[in-house]
Amino acid sequence: EEVIMNPNTEIVDAIKKSIPLKYALVKNAQVIKLLPDDKNGPLHQRWIMEIENGLTITVFYNVDIAERVPIDVGSYVDVAGELEYGDRWKDPIMHWTHDDPQGQRKAGYVILNGTTYGQATGP
């Protein structure tokens, strides 16, 4: 019998223990809800993705730095970025899901249908 490994096991374990990860890669997560853009500071596109049996992460993606991701509910995405927790959010969040213009962090990204988003479009 073939055993299918969950590619998100490390992230699931971190979330269950509320451990932040400076760089995490979530693979093949389903977008379950689109949220209004976050306009506090730089403009961020936001969505909620499910990584396993009801376990969700809210994604913040800076559209001032990189082009908007053309996602819909039901889309499957790979997302790389920083995993954090906070009193302001119900779910764990992923941010820095795009290039860091200052180059101080490993570049995050979003992959949708084989296309990578999150590369810097500015100077």
Per-range role (PLM):
Residues 1-123:
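OB-fold and OB-like single-stranded nucleic-acid-recognition modules
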